[in-house]
Each structure stands twice: as C-alpha cells, then as structure tokens.
Amino acid sequence: IVWILCVWVLSLPLQAQSYNDVVEQAMDCVKKDSLVQAERLFRQALKMEPDNARNALLFSNLGTVQKRMGKTDEAIESYTLALNIIPYSTTMLLNRAALYLEKDLIQKAYLDYCNVIDLLPKNLEARLFRAYIYMQRREYKEARVDYNVVLEQDVKNKTARIGIIMLDEKEGRHQSAMDAMNLLVSDYPRDVSILRMRANMEWEHGQAEAALFDLDEVLKLDPRDASCYVMKGDIHLQQKKKAEAREAYEKALELGVSRAELAEKLKQCK
C-alpha cells in the first residue's frame, strides 16, 4: 500500500500536467530550436483540449514550426485549421499565403492576400505580393494600383519602385522607366541587382557602352558575378568584338557557368 501511495504521489505532476504546461513546454522547445519536440508537444496540447479557444494560436504556432521544418503541406493545413477558428487573422492569412506561393498555388495565395487587403487596405506585404501576382498574370493596371498604394506610405520602397519601373517598361514608357531607374541607382549605388537591372535596360535601349559601364561597376562590387560576364560577352558579340566576347565568356566559365550553356556563343566568337 505504501508503494502504491508513493507511485501515486510521484505521478501527480504528470497526471496534473495541464494544457498550459504542455503549451509552455512547446514554446520553450521553439526557443531552443527543438522543433521536433515542439511539434509533438503542440499536437499533444491540441488533443488534450480540442475545444480550447486558444487552439487557433496553437495551430498557428504549429504551422510556423512545420514551416521551419520544411513540412510545407502540413504547415498549410495547420494554418488552415487556425483560420477555421479565427478567419480574420491577417497574420495567419499572410503566413498561409506565403506558403501557397512557395507551392506555386497562385490563386489560393491571391485570395488570401485579397482577404488581408479587405481587412487592412494599407498592408504593405499583401499589396506587394498581390502586385507580384498581378504582374505574373499581366494584369498591369491592377499591379500599378497596388504598387502606388505602397509608395503612398513608403515613398522609398525599393520593391514597389522596381515594380513601377518594370510596368513603365512593359507599357512603353521607356524614358519614365529610365529616369526612375537612375534615381533608384543613386539611392542604392552599391546594390548589384539594381545596377544589373539598369545595365539590361540600357542594352535593350541600344545604350551598349552605358550597359558595359554598369556591368563593370557590378564586377567591382562582386568580382564573381558570372552572369555579368555572360552579359558582357553577349554585348561584345553583338558589337562584333569577338575577342572581347570570348574573354568575357571564358571568365564566366571559370566562375562556374557550364560550357554547354555557352557553346554556341563561343562558336560565334571564332
């Protein structure tokens, strides 16, 4: 009898382990990056009290853990279960939308971003990603509206400014696009992606020397940018400067570009 009583006393903490205790343990595991353990504990808490009003947050936390573990489908399911309880949570909608985009489920992501914008019309993340989706669909008028909403709140927003430049290019407003591009470069003079983008625009507009100058600026900042050497080779080849083109292509090969990718271009350099 004494032994039974001792076992009963020792087991009290386990038996009395509450929903809140398990949730706290799960959160501690998240902080320690013990994600497998955190996932197990969140599931345990959800089974303990399936009707608890806090389960929306638990499903959301579970989804975030699963996202970090690379379990995208399970994370989407967890966020969906959370949204079944709290359908107007913009944070959960944004988290699920990002995963839908990752899975290339564009229409589902679009609907989530629309729902966020209905709730928070000035939400920058939703506006930017919806604009991106509109761009993919070639719905340029709608994309411009979203980018402009972002710029009304954040006039220096780089992503929105790039979006407007791309729209101007697609709609034939080349001077407007180039003016905006020049301003962007002046604001971000060491951003290689922006310099590379301007070089591409300059080349398309027949400004080969300006493009080559920008590519050289990129290579000063990032000497191992193989794509710049490929582009330099393409420009030189177009200019009939075969020796310079070959030199650029050979440098790209040294930096890891496959010979098969450049084989035809190298033939044209002979």
Regions found by a protein language model. Give the residues of each.
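Structural marker of alpha-solenoid helical repeat scaffolds
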Residues: 48-51, 85, 119, 153, ...
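Terminal, low-structured helical/coil segments at or just beyond the last alpha-helical repeat
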Residues: 19, 230, 234, 238-270
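Canonical tetratricopeptide repeat
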Residues: 57-61, 95, 129, 163, ...
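Helix-start (N-cap) detector for alpha-helical repeat units in TPR-like alpha-solenoids
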Residues: 19-20, 53-57, 90-91, 124-125, ...
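Register position in tetratricopeptide repeats
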Residues: 31-32, 65-68, 102-103, 136-137, ...
